[in-house]
Every structure is written in structure tokens, then in C-alpha cells.
Design a protein with these regions (language model features):
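Core catalytic lobe of class I
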Residues: 1-212, 246-247
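S-adenosyl-L-methionine
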Residues: 214-247
Length: 247
């Protein structure tokens, strides 16, 4: 989608994305959206305030006919410099004034479900998709505190760790399924799909991020592994799409 200054236009463009995702989803399939609310600093907006992006996405998704499910709050280390001017003391504001700023240390993992009954799978496919008791207990909690945010050294302003995508893929798909990522970024979702033994299709319009993702996926596809996809094939379309096939 690129960068938009107009927030309402940005939401309208997101509506187009959710509509297309819903079109290609299987019945009962889920859209997993990792999103942080937007903190506007005083220097930019004249006052510090928050734009509730996660709430707006949920409200508009309902109007598109998608079901909103219980989200997960992901507690991670935020980049304070992108929120407000800190004071070097680990907090914002002054201890003797009531105008302190709460750090935005969470992102929302939203789940939007397409209507219809979810399909059943053959016994072998179910066996390959089995989660452990420990994974079920940890991953189905509504707050995740054990995953650190991904480094921004790649140049992408909002990356997320491959492990986060791997959890979501394993929770909501069968082995051998195809996962679609309309915002590939640096390729975390497709890397996770290979590790989890799923196929993937990823789209990214920013050339710099696309090249980073392609390089990362080539490395992952070459690795020898004994779980997930024991072999992976990568097809890079210069029209800014990537496809990985798990074998």
C-alpha cells in the first residue's frame, strides 16, 4: 500500500486488503493481523495522543462481514524514540507532575474470521499439525510476554519475529496449507511457513524490503531440517510476489 498521510484513506485501503483476504480464505479461515496503535508525539501533533488503529480495523472488519475473535496482547520492548521524547530515566514525563505518558509496549494480534464451517483434514495431516500440551497452554493465552520484538536494523520500521509468525501459523492452519501475507516486509511470515511445513504466498511493493525478504527466504530454504518442511522451493516474481513450497 505504501505510505499514507491521510488516516481515513489508509483505513479504506486496508478494507480492500481484508476484502481480498476474505475472498481467498477457506471457510472458517482466519486473518491474523499484528498491529500497533499509532502514538503521535507532541512535536508532530501539538499534543501527545494515540490513534487506536487496532480498534478501527476491528470495527471496519465487522462491517465487511468478518467475525472478530479474542485478540492477543503481545508485550514487547517498544522503541520509545518513536513515541515521545524520553528523559533518559526509563519513563516519560516528570515525577512531580500528573502528565506522565504510558509507554506503548504492546501490539495487538487481531483475529478476523471468515464465515463458514472450517474444513476437516485427513488423519496424517492432523498428525503433522499436532501441537504439544505446553504449546497449547502457552500460545492460547491472551497475553504473550515471552517474545522480544525483532530488530529494526534491516531498515524496516515495524518487523516482527519469525517465531511469532510460526506460532500463529501452527495455531490456525494444517501442515501443507498455504499461508498468504499481503504485507511481506522482510519475509518473517514466509520464513515461518517453511519452518512450520506450510506453503506461502507473500506480496511486498517496497523494492528494498522485497530484496531483504528474498535473501532471507533463500537462506531458510537452503537449510537442512528434520521437522517442518524438510525441503523448500522458492519462486521470486519480480512483480513483487514470492511463493515458497514446503515439501
Amino acid at each position: 500500500m505504501g505510505h499514507f498521510e491521510d488516516y481515513e484513506h489508509f483505513l479504506t485501503e486496508l478494507d480492500r486488503v481484508w476484502t481480498e483476504c476474505a475472498r481467498v480464505l477457506v471457510g472458517g479461515g482466519r486473518i491474523c493481523c499484528v498491529v500497533g496503535d499509532v502514538c503521535i508525539p507532541r512535536k508532530q501533533g501539538g499534543r501527545h495522543y494515540l490513534v487506536p488503529l487496532h480498534s478501527d480495523i476491528q470495527v471496519r472488519a465487522r462491517k465487511l462481514g468478518l467475525d472478530c475473535l479474542t485478540p492477543i496482547l503481545w508485550h514487547k520492548i517498544a522503541n520509545g524514540a518513536m513515541e515521545a521524547q524520553g528523559n533518559g530515566a526509563g519513563f516519560y514525563g516528570k515525577p512531580y507532575q500528573p502528565g506522565g505518558i504510558i509507554k506503548n509496549d504492546i501490539e495487538h494480534i487481531l483475529f478476523l474470521r471468515k464465515g463458514g464451517e472450517y474444513r476437516s483434514a485427513p488423519m496424517m495431516q492432523k498428525a503433522l499439525s499436532m501441537l504439544t500440551r505446553e504449546e497449547m497452554q502457552a500460545w492460547q493465552r491472551s497475553i504473550w510476554t515471552d517474545l522480544r520484538g525483532a530488530s529494526t536494523r534491516s531498515g524496516h520500521p515495524a518487523p516482527y519475529p519469525v517465531e511469532l509468525a510460526e506460532r500463529l501459523i501452527k495455531l490456525f492452519s494444517f501442515a501443507g496449507d498455504t499461508v498468504l501475507d499481503p504485507f511481506a516486509g522482510t519475509g518473517s511470515t514466509s520464513q515461518a511457513a517453511i519452518i512450520a511445513g506450510r506453503n506461502s504466498i507473500a506480496n511486498e511493493i517496497e523494492p528494498a524490503y522485497f530484496e531483504i525478504a528474498a535473501r532471507s527466504l533463500r537462506k531458510v530454504a537452503r537449510r537442512v531440517r528434520f521437522t517442518g518442511a524438510v525441503e523448500a522451493r522458492l519462486d521470486v516474481d519480480r512483480g513483487r510476489a514470492m511463493r515458497s513450497a514446503a515439501v
